[in-house]
């Protein structure tokens, strides 16, 4: 697992299946995997393409570190366009008012994966903030359905 930021910025251990070659693994989580990079194992590519590498996060939900829906947990010092998210998006910490989720509004709208540019990073945070401002059971159900279709049925995992 990797250390991620939870509610109120509290660090927690995020559980995932290993999809990278051990010798090329980045335990910090700052070096994001891009596409089908050479660091991924053959099985790892399949797990990531179907998002099955996320299944161990059900344990994070059971022990209270995460919820089913909420902003996806990020690594401390996560970067976008070579700069810390907090520099790129000044209201970044607003997303930590809720526990992180297995899926979120940004992910359900296709905003996931590596963020090498400012625009996608800001859109991701904007979606997280919109989720918090419009939190409801109906929105959670919409996110769960969209995530299931996008990640598991169409295999759009990154």
Enumerate the language-model features and the residues they cover.
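Conserved small/aromatic sequence motifs within transmembrane helices
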Residues: 1-158
